[in-house]
Design a protein with these regions (language model features):
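Acidic-basic catalytic patches of nuclease active cores, encompassing PD-(D/E)XK
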Residues: 1-36
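Conserved catalytic cores of phosphodiester-cleaving nucleases, focusing on short active-site segments
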Residues: 22, 44-59
Length: 150
């Protein structure tokens, strides 16, 4: 059965793993910072991007689409954030990213057992860009993670 607390813990650890990796290998000069406000609808940012991470327990191509809550996009639209919006997906076979494009997704209602009907964004996996297979949703925090995370 789905457990909210365990799901949140799992997600928070994966956020640190991904931000550490991205700061080491991609955003060396403009490091990503995790939001400390737990009420934020997105996970991290720097001067260039706003990022959201979804961690999955399947391979990237297990389904024709991947999804996340529409509240993430709605928040960024409402905030009128001018940075690039990137949605990262940590699958069992690697880290992928989708850069927001209003023509590359659809919104459909999803019946959540505990939360009722919620709008979800569905993105065709053909729009996902593979970043690396060096980290997966099964990865652990590296020993030097604190050197790369705010």
């Amino acid at each position: 059965m789905w457990n909210l607390i365990e799901d949140l813990k799992y997600g928070k650890i994966r956020e640190k793993i991904v931000v550490c990796f991205l700061n080491k290998d991609i955003f060396k000069d403009d490091k990503l910072r995790l939001y400390s406000n737990q009420k934020k609808q997105v996970d991290f940012r720097n001067e260039e991007i706003v990022g959201e991470l979804k961690s999955r327990t399947n391979k990237h191509n297990a389904y024709p689409t991947t999804f996340f809550g529409y509240n993430k996009i709605k928040y960024l639209i409402d905030e009128d954030d001018k940075r690039v919006w990137k949605f990262y997906f940590l699958f069992t076979d690697g880290l992928y990213v989708w850069t927001y494009n209003k023509d590359q997704y659809e919104v459909r209602d999803y019946q959540h057992k505990e939360r009722g009907i919620i709008p979800q964004v569905y993105v065709d996996i053909k729009y996902l860009e593979k970043i690396s297979s060096n980290i997966t949703s099964n990865s652990c925090l590296p020993s030097d993670w604190e050197d790369f995370i705010n």
